[in-house]
């Protein structure tokens, strides 16, 4: 639904502008703020209702790496409660062959929980060594799994010898690609800090957001009422995803953010010049 790609200059620029506008340094933001954490599983802290926001019930609109319906579903199903949970969920969002038909089913069947699931390549290495597997062998197994090359029979026997459960071994075999934990930590850090500003400094947040995207933002079309914005959103979402243009994607992304802004009681957008 909403995507900004990778962690880049835009995200760093917006954080710098928010620091300047609010006087709050990003590195002073605590990662255990419960209200900010709640944005990753619900929308209550923003004091708006999901039905007003076209059914979006998570407070992550406008944050980087919160991109597709799949990501929304993963956050909704896992309901992260801590910063470390957010890191793990991002690993599930970005990896290939890790969520659908794999960890999602294991969690549903109570074979594992978020904290014990494979989410990043680091999880495999640490778990194998904790179970007593030689570090060199554990690293070789991890490298093979994270590249989607699976587990050899010799490695599988080694894992069973160290009491690695069957569900874990089968999960490893389904993985096509895994990201490193450090990658997800950096993204989670940016998401959390932006979530803090979004929650506690809404005017400054939306000002910074749209000043960064002024070249892609159609003020004339989007500075309208809530009902008109909903019509725009629903109209674009009726178009099959593969048939949507880049302009459609930008319009949809920005329409959601403007609608959310209006629902939070802000009626105008102030841009910041470069």
Residue ranges, per PLM feature:
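Noncatalytic, beta-rich nucleic-acid-contacting surfaces in large DNA/RNA-processing enzymes
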Residues: 1-274
């Amino acid at each position: 639904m909403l995507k900004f790609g990778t962690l880049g200059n835009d995200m760093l620029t917006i954080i710098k502008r928010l620091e300047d506008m609010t006087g709050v340094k990003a590195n002073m933001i605590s990662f255990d703020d419960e209200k900010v954490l709640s944005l990753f599983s619900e929308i209550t802290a923003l004091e708006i209702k999901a039905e007003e926001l076209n059914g979006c019930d998570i407070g992550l609109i406008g944050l980087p790496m919160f991109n597709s319906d799949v990501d929304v579903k993963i956050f909704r199903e896992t309901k992260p409660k801590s910063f470390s949970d957010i890191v793990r969920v991002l690993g599930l969002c970005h990896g290939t062959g890790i969520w659908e038909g794999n960890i999602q089913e294991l969690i549903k069947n109570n074979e594992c929980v978020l904290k014990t699931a494979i989410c990043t390549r680091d999880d495999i290495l640490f778990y194998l060594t904790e179970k007593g597997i030689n570090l060199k062998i554990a690293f070789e197994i991890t490298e093979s799994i994270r590249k989607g090359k699976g587990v050899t029979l010799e490695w599988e026997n080694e894992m069973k010898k160290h009491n690695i459960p069957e569900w874990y071994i089968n999960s490893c075999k389904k993985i096509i690609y895994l990201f490193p934990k450090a990658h997800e930590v950096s993204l989670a850090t940016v998401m959390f800090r932006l979530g803090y500003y979004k929650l506690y400094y809404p005017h400054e947040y939306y000002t910074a957001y749209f000043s960064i995207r002024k070249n892609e933002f159609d003020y004339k079309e989007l500075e309208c009422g809530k009902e008109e914005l909903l019509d725009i959103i629903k109209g674009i979402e009726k178009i099959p995803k593969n048939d949507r243009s880049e302009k459609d994607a930008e319009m949809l992304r920005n329409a959601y953010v403007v609608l959310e802004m209006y629902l939070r009681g802000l009626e105008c957008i102030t841009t910041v010049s470069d």
